[in-house]
């Protein structure tokens, strides 16, 4: 399709986005052709418009609403390392979940003993002016597994101002490894509020890379990891 992506478009193929959007996504590491990727997720404003969960037998990728319906135990991972009352942004995200009955965002899980070298790509895209986009993501690396994620976040070319609140909770089981690379390319009047926390068990390794490619109105970020096991290691770079 040559029409611009908006919040009501559901895509059969990630490559169906218009050329301008393709270029915007590529700037934040999201390849619409899905070359050398193990899964894909795209959220536009509050709507999940595309998910590809069929690219790897080692990794699960789905939107949070689907994941919560599939796995009863997933509730145990919600709002555990990021508290809903941590600040007004987490509170707004939690309230929106409660009022709508829908949890926006993505669920990614690497299966026990697997080592997927190709990254999952997830994109949070703001397509409407003055939107407050919220997302609540849960990432789980099961025991002795390895998982790589590229999270690319961007606004459409015609967007001047908006707010993005991304709550991400990550859990590394014993011997697991996650490399999490977040790339942001926002309009100048966008307010950015990532809220990231990680829980690590023994012998786990977490690597966090944050890249901001454009000026923004304001950004507040303080990613925090809890090393709850012997030889749990973490590295943060921005």
Predicted regions and their residues:
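Long, low-complexity, mixed-charge
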Residues: 1-101
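Conserved beta-strand/loop scaffold segments within soluble protein domains that form the structured core
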Residues: 77, 81-238
């Amino acid at each position: 399709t040559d029409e611009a992506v908006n919040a009501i478009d559901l895509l059969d193929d990630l490559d169906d986005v218009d050329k301008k959007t393709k270029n915007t996504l590529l700037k934040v590491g999201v390849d619409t052709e899905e070359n050398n990727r193990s899964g894909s997720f795209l959220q536009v404003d509050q709507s999940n418009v595309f998910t590809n969960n069929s690219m790897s037998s080692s990794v699960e990728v789905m939107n949070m609403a689907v994941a919560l319906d599939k796995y009863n135990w997933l509730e145990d991972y919600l709002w555990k390392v990021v508290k809903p009352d941590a600040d007004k942004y987490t509170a707004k995200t939690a309230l929106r979940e409660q009022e709508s009955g829908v949890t926006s965002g993505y669920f990614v899980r690497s299966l026990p003993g697997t080592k997927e070298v190709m990254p999952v790509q997830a994109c949070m895209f703001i397509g409407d002016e003055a939107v407050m986009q919220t997302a609540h993501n849960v990432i789980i690396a099961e025991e002795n597994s390895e998982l790589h994620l590229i999270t690319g976040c961007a606004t459409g070319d015609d967007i001047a101002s908006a707010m993005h609140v991304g709550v991400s909770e990550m859990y590394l089981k014993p011997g697991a490894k996650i490399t999490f690379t977040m790339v942001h390319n926002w309009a100048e009047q966008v307010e950015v509020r990532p809220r990231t926390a990680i829980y690590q068990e023994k012998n786990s390794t977490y690597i966090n890379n944050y890249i901001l490619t454009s000026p923004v109105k304001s950004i507040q970020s303080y990613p925090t990891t809890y090393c709850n096991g012997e030889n749990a290691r973490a590295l943060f770079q921005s």
